[in-house]
Structure formats: structure tokens, C-alpha cells
Amino acid sequence: MLKGHLHSVESMGTVDGPGLRYILFTQGCLLRCLYCHNPDTWKINEPSREVTVDEMVNEILPYKPYFEASGGGVTVSGGEPLLQMPFLEQLFKELKANGVHTCIDTSAGCVNDTPAFNRHFDELQKHTDLILLDIKHIDNDKHIKLTGKPNTHILKFARKLSDMKQPVWIRHVLVPGISDDKEDLIKLGEFINSLDNVEKFEILPYHQLGVHKWKNLGIPYQLENVEPPDDEAVKEAYRYVNFNGKIPVTL
């Protein structure tokens, strides 16, 4: 029986998609982001909770009244959820059959052009209402330094989603001295504004809430002396990106 490998769940999330959301954090990720707040999700073979589709649907459906009242639903994050597409295909198909909004939060690090990947993603996309795409850095060399992987396949994937008319929110973590360069943010905005499917752009201010996990795993944390950006730096970044010619009115 097909099973998913989960790191954890959050029953009432409010930041990973619209409304109140049940969030599944999957195990396994190919990127090694310097600021990752879930480094304990990197290894897909680490001890994790194995679940069937039926088990998860039964856990999720009692929350449906909250989804309906808030415009929420289910978000699968990670880790990297696209490493477990066969499981997600079945899960999202069942959730949609029960009238639940579905969302994937991905950094697209595992995206590739193999027939197997494209076949599974095309099937998964049929049952996916929204994708949150994290673009870590628009500059390829800086992306490699930040995550350990290039960004060329990620940007290509963003264009594919645009061609598919798949609704997308794009998110960018703002790290002082790493991903806050003016010219890079302007280029990021030009790229985003060239896509036809982006409903929302969000800047996520860097934080250190996951540093203790790095220490518990015995992994050196290279950004320990980096302070989170202040509100003015975040506003300035929004102005540089200039998504659709405006900045969020809620700042």
C-alpha cells in the first residue's frame, strides 16, 4: 500500500495559503538552504511517520467546517513535497472529491525533465488548486551558494506553471546580505511580472527560529550572526520587486 512519509502536521496553519489550513510537512529535501528552519526534514530516510491516504483523509475531514468558514484547506509543505508525488496524487484526488482546497508549498529543487516526473506532476496538477513557489534567489551563482543547487530548473518550472495557467503565489525569503541586493530584487520582480499566473507575491523575513535544530543535529549554522531584516528593509524589498506595479497595502 502506498504511504507518505511525514515529518509533522499542523492542524490550524494561517500563513501557508489562504484561510485556515491543515498543513502536512513531508520528509525529504534536496536543497540545503543556509537558513532552513526544518533541517530535520532533509533526509527522506530519517525516522518519520508513515501514513496512508485514507488515514490522512480521515484526520483532515473533521476540519472541513473551518476550511469552509475561512476559505482554507490543505497545504502540503516540507521538506519537499514533490519528492512524494505518487502519494500526493492520491491524497489530493480524495481531498478534491470531498470539496477540500489543495495547495503545495514547494521550492522545486527536485524538478526535472524526465518522463516519470512530468507524468506524475501533470496528474498531480489536475487536483491542485494552488502552488506556493519559493524562489530562493534569482541569481544562479548566489542560489548555489545559498542552497547547494542551481536555480535554472526552478525558473523553468515557474514558466511551465505559467504556461499551464496554474495559480501560483511566489515567495522569497529576505536574508540581509544574501538575498536583499537591490539589483537582484529588481531582476526577481522582472521575472515574476513576466509570468501570467502569479496571484500574489510575498516576502518572508529571515528568522532564526530553527537554529536549535541545527545545533541538535550537530550541523554548523553559518548565519548565526545575521539579524532579521527590519520592517523598512522589507518594505524597500517590496518596492524593488514592484510586483504588478504595487506593494502590499497591509505592510
UniProtKB/Swiss-Prot annotation:
Cofactors: [4Fe-4S] cluster
What are the record's GO terms for cellular component?
cytoplasm
Residues annotated as domain Radical SAM core: 15-244
Cofactor binding mode, per the note? Binds 1 [4Fe-4S] cluster. The cluster is coordinated with 3 cysteines and an exchangeable S-adenosyl-L-methionine.
Keyword flag 4Fe-4S: yes
Instruction: Name the reaction it catalyses.
Output: glycyl-[formate C-acetyltransferase] + reduced [flavodoxin] + S-adenosyl-L-methionine = glycin-2-yl radical-[formate C-acetyltransferase] + semiquinone [flavodoxin] + 5'-deoxyadenosine + L-methionine + H(+)
Which UniProt keywords are listed?
Answer: 4Fe-4S, Carbohydrate metabolism, Cytoplasm, Glucose metabolism, Iron, Iron-sulfur, Metal-binding, Oxidoreductase, S-adenosyl-L-methionine
Q: Which residues bind S-adenosyl-L-methionine?
A: 35-37, 79, 134-136, 207
Record's keyword annotation contains Nucleotide-binding: no
Which BP terms in the Gene Ontology apply to this protein?
Answer: glucose metabolic process
Specify the superkingdom: Bacteria
Q: What is its EC number?
A: 1.97.1.4
Query: Record's CDD domains?
Result: Radical_SAM (cd01335)
Where mainly found? cytoplasm
**Pfam families, alphabetically?**
Fer4_12, Radical_SAM
- Annotated SUPFAM superfamilies: Radical SAM enzymes
GO molecular function of the protein, one example? 4 iron, 4 sulfur cluster binding
Q: Tell where it localizes.
A: Cytoplasm
Please name the top-level EC class of this enzyme.
oxidoreductase
- The residues that hold [4Fe-4S] cluster are 29, 33, 36
Similarity comment text for this entry: Belongs to the organic radical-activating enzymes family.
Q: Which PANTHER family match?
A: PYRUVATE FORMATE-LYASE 1-ACTIVATING ENZYME, PYRUVATE FORMATE-LYASE-ACTIVATING ENZYME
Function in brief: Activation of pyruvate formate-lyase under anaerobic conditions by generation of an organic free radical, using S-adenosylmethionine and reduced flavodoxin as cosubstrates to produce 5'-deoxy-adenosine.
Name listed for the protein in its UniProt record:
Pyruvate formate-lyase-activating enzyme
- The record lists the organism as Staphylococcus epidermidis (strain ATCC 35984 / DSM 28319 / BCRC 17069 / CCUG 31568 / BM 3577 / RP62A)
Quote the gene name from the UniProt entry.
Answer: pflA
